[in-house]
Amino acid sequence: MTDNKNQVKDEVLAYEMLESRGPKGAPKGDPVLSVRDLRVSFATEAGRVDAVRGVNFDLWGGRTLGIVGESGSGKSVTALSLIGLLDDNAHVEGSVKLKGEELLGKTDEEMSKLRGSRISMVFQDPLSALTPMFSIGDQLAEALLIHNPKMSKEDVHKRCVELLTLVGITDPEDRLDAYPHEFSGGMRQRVVIAIAIANNPEIIIADEPTTALDVTIQAQILDVLKVAQKETGAAVVIITHDLGVVAGIADDIMVMYAGAAVERASVDSLFANPAQPYTMGLLGAVPQPHVAAEHRLVPIKGNPPSLAAIPSGCPFSPRCPMAQEKCHRIEPKLEPFAAEEGHLVSCHRLAEIRDKHMTYQDVYPELEPLPAKWADVPRDQRPIVLEVKDLVKTFPIQSKGLIRRNKGTMTAVDHVSFKIHEGETMALVGESGSGKSTTLTQIMELMKPEGGSITVLGKNIADIGNNRERRELRKNLQVIFQDPMSSLDPRMPIYDVLAEPLKAQHWDDAKINKRIGELMYLVGINPDYVDRFPSQFSGGQRQRIAIARALATNPKILLLDEPIASLDVSIQAGIINLLEDLQAELKISYLFVAHDLAVIRHISDTVAVMHLGKIVEYGETEDVYTYPKDPYTQALLSAIPIPDPQIERTRKRLVYQDGKLVPAESLLPTKL
């Protein structure tokens, strides 16, 4: 224990020597926030959970620190510990100083005075931060008055209008009387940012502030966050899993794994010279939205360790391709990779990585080319497996009040047409409300549509005469959802989950047993695990099992509704590779709905862009991404965050407004 404490002390002293010069580009003077040897553990029934283990960093006013890592790496716990919002069973050690004032050890009452005034938080889900029973104006006023009780009513109202204007809410005077449910998700997040900056805080902590938003709304929220920072001069800590977001907004980056920082650098240094094998793996797993896909993605094998049972030595060693015997025994310390830039890395093989100028291509297995998709048979000469013609779907618009009356109709899908050939992947993209999920639902239901036609494997579903025919067709058209638990019964072992669709097709036990073994092998899950329950698998493994269930009846078409949206980037890469392998082997066709446009470019052959229920652009994926013709498509593609800070700084983002393209910077709110 004494040796461990001495090692921690040495690390803190070494870190302070490096950080005393500040990261590259940091302003002179003392940091606003100084964190030393931060440790957070939780007492649970499963034992002690070490969620944060010896984190150190400094942050200056006007600068942004991005904290990245997989789920369970300790990012959010680190953020919550800074603002004193951890659960009662948390034990916190170390030091967190706000302009020299120690925050750890303060009472709840003392921290309440700081929260919202000197340090603020923006959460992932704005509804968790907004009270549905109170108007937006009331909630803004509360944020002001709780720290400024002597503010006059007129000053409060004026400041509320200023704040809504600053975050880009139109008609702020009228919007003060609105309630959270009357705002869209993006507008609610703007309001949360307005509340966070109401009292000009010195630090803003944003925990996954754009995760649930469309790419265009995400870009707008990040712009608002930048304006808020400029207005207040605050230091910003942003927690995210999206390396493209970090590249565009952060000055410095800290990569966390198993509760500890494994790499810390300026954004330029880390993206140009990632030196920790884990960081390299994260960057290798990310699809590049600005270039054509030439190689398979590089997933990181395995899963992050349980924080209740962190392995000895380097926690990443069980997954690291470079791990040696020493890596499994001794946890490495943070050491300088490029000291003049404050680039710190924890890896026993750092000297070798630095001297040989190693990249992720050297560390991870050689990149394989994408699997061939039957180049001998042109796609347009293969059979059409799914054809949609002039599809229409409307919904009634009802009046408010006790007696609901139809006031008209809203067209969710407006004469949509497309076709998918055997072995082809087609993507439907667009913002929320564009009609893509409704289109998918209409195909899924296998019922006669309100307007137009849907033809599956040459059969017009309007001509299906009975349930037997529909059941026969359904086995060839299966669905994979975003949340695998929606298709996996938590009370059933995996064997029963996979056997259920086969029993519905009246397979005998011998054939079922053989097929389940084949399915587990296909999706890369050990067949010995068939007696386990869904809760005993990781998120990525559960999605593989959901894919296996969808493949059980040998379908010709898979409908994929955001199948990787809830997964870490390293796990996403494995699922994408799996889908590509299955398509090459089985000649299966995919209709892929997703909001991640980088993934779409990597996996799809054709893409249809939807806006307000209509397809506004449709064609070969590379043609659409390289030479977009429709203004809406151009705006959509310009909003994709690219995991390269050099490119992100020089890009010009466009906004589609009133039927035309407008430079995003012209719409940014400015200092009042």
Residue locations for each model-derived region?
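P-loop NTP-binding/switch modules centered on Walker-like glycine-rich loops
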Residues: 70, 84-85, 205-209, 213-295, ...
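ABC ATPase NBD coupling module
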Residues: 89, 103-120, 146, 269-274, ...
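Charged, flexible cofactor/metal-binding loops and thiol motifs
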Residues: 18-21, 26-31, 45, 267-384, ...
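Conserved signature/switch motifs of ABC ATPase nucleotide-binding domains
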Residues: 116, 181, 199, 475, ...
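Helix-to-loop junction immediately C-terminal to a conserved catalytic motif
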Residues: 83-84, 444
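Conserved ABC transporter NBD signature motif
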Residues: 91-102, 452-463
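Conserved ABC ATPase "signature" region
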Residues: 155-174, 283, 460, 510-528, ...
